């Protein structure tokens, strides 16, 4: 997500593709909630650490200690134990047992769920529409490529 879109690879016949390949041209936002844990915690922390865009929703769960399945018991089962901890430049050790706070906190209520609404998603859409209004992403028009004479 952090790779910058630099331009397009424009084939003679075919559809232009992003350059570098698979880069995005536009604004980003992360949507998260209290059920986001483990790699979801780390994704949200990384998204904030890199300054890729706002985070909308609720604070993440806060469970990033990694486990290792090192020992096998005589009955064939395996035990796991805490083994790895995550430290971020900006957040330090604070993600474990706390989580990542959103930039814009939105509480989803049981009533909205019953009504079939997702208040966090609705707020995220509002934020992105406003950002697009303030910082539009213009469409690209490709002129004919220049004619290059053969070298002499």
Functional labels for PLM-detected ranges:
Residues 1-152:
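C-terminal "post-core" interaction segments
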């Amino acid at each position: 997500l952090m790779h910058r879109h630099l331009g397009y690879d424009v084939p003679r016949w075919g559809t232009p593709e992003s350059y570098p390949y698979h880069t995005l041209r536009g604004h980003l936002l992360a949507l998260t909630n209290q059920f986001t844990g483990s790699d979801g915690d780390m994704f949200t922390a990384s998204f904030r650490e890199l300054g890729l865009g706002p985070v909308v929703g609720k604070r993440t769960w806060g469970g990033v200690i990694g486990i290792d399945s090192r020992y096998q018991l005589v009955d064939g089962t395996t035990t796991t134990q805490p083994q790895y901890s995550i430290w971020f430049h900006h957040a330090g050790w604070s993600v474990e047992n706390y989580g990542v706070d959103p930039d814009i906190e939105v509480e989803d209520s049981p009533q909205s769920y019953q009504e079939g609404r997702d208040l966090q998603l609705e707020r995220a859409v509002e934020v992105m529409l406003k950002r697009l209004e303030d910082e539009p992403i213009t469409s690209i028009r490709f002129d004919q490529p220049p004619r290059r004479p053969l070298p002499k």
